């Protein structure tokens, strides 16, 4: 499975084409719109969330609610497009009807993108580099989540830190954490930390600044053996890290203990292996068990049967209402950077995008391992594989 996206932040729409989905997978606009709505939630979002009410249209590859096996086309329309008809027109006759943006923002793609592509109007860069692009990736992720669900795999996540305010680690089962996060404006399952996060966001907004944070994605039900150790580009942890790092403003990724593993001796890092055949009667996939999960469900580039746990660190959004110093590329004079409509804190939205890209990578890994042209064929291949693991 592979996909590409197209579209600009203030263009008419965002488009994705997904190739390689099996036939027979259930897809509905409602399942896509649910994830798009989650992306627009969260305390600290900007005014654009009041303008946009994202909806996904399915244009190809699906008939009567099920995939056909042909490419699937998804579209998320930009409802603010009417206000940008001439500024973002593809027609040459409208050239010059919008003032050029010549003051690049520190922390954005503006300056390096303009230099790379030879643009004197930074808008030609910022429109595509905007995190608005993640809306259609979330729609693709919703399709991938559907495949995971069809194969008895569950995915969710929580916000664990905002601007240095950290939630206490929860001992609750992951599904309960997800339910608590769903009831939180911060997607956080620590009520006390949520209050502190919101207070910090309010203060930060009042001084025209922004905040970043850390999100954690958790996945249950993954069979052992997704990914591979045999080549660098087949290692699932590497692919997950690349997917997460591709999200705008993500600057770091941890799997399991992550950087904490570097601070501990090996005896406090590696997960011991036990064998308990009674696990099979309890619905587990194999008789092998780990008393701990410091590896985060991945060893040697492959899933090991334990829950997948991966975190991503988001830097503060670089568009500030108290702008940093920049240079006008037309005059080379120092100026304050230009200001685009933006959020104070988009960490909850980043969690939804992180879940989406993790779901996409896992869907690709599942199709590589259990590949088939239809969902029924994939299920048969998976069941045969798991039957062999029960006696391993």
UniProtKB/Swiss-Prot annotation:
Leader sequence segment: none
Gene3D superfamilies for the chain: Chorismate synthase AroC (3.60.150.10)
Any one Pfam family match given in the protein's UniProt record, by short name: Chorismate_synt
UniProt EC number: 4.2.3.5
Pathway(s) it belongs to: Metabolic intermediate biosynthesis; chorismate biosynthesis; chorismate from D-erythrose 4-phosphate and phosphoenolpyruvate: step 7/7
InterPro entries: Chorismate_synth, Chorismate_synth_AroC_sf, Chorismate_synthase_CS
Binding site for NADP(+): 39, 45
Catalytic activity: 5-O-(1-carboxyvinyl)-3-phosphoshikimate = chorismate + phosphate
Record's function text: This reaction introduces a second double bond into the aromatic ring system.
Family (UniProt): Belongs to the chorismate synthase family.
Subunit structure: Homotetramer.
Annotated protein name in UniProt: Chorismate synthase
Organism: Trichlorobacter lovleyi (strain ATCC BAA-1151 / DSM 17278 / SZ)
